[in-house]
Amino acid sequence: MARILLAEDDDTLRVFLTRAIERAGHEVTDVDRGTKALPFIASGDFDLLLTDIVMPEMDGIELAQRAATLAPKMQVMFITGFAAVALNRKNETPQQPKVLSKPFHLRDLVGEIEKILSAA
């Protein structure tokens, strides 16, 4: 079982993703914006940050950059409808994070999470 921090501003999607990831056997802490994720990241208690890119207050790319400093061993995965932004923006996110474009099937999400965690 891995500990996953989910940052997603869409309430319905966040609840849906949390349930699916928990059913796959992982522990999930979810927040609705990047700024709320920072204290959890600083705790160092998470294996994976699963974050949307477009969120209020702090986008997922900035959140991943801060995560690289606060918890360098934590893996990062983006879920977004704006994959081109993640792939083209020059940034210093940890270890070339995986980008999963919305819409996606839950089995694809869980499969990608398992790949990332097993490679860590």
Regions found by a protein language model. Give the residues of each.
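Active-site residues of response regulator receiver
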Residues: 52
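C-terminal output helix
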Residues: 104-114
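Charged docking surfaces used in two-component/phosphorelay signaling
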Residues: 15-23
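Conserved acidic carboxylate
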Residues: 8
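Receiver (REC) domain active-site loop signature in two-component systems and cognate sites
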Residues: 55
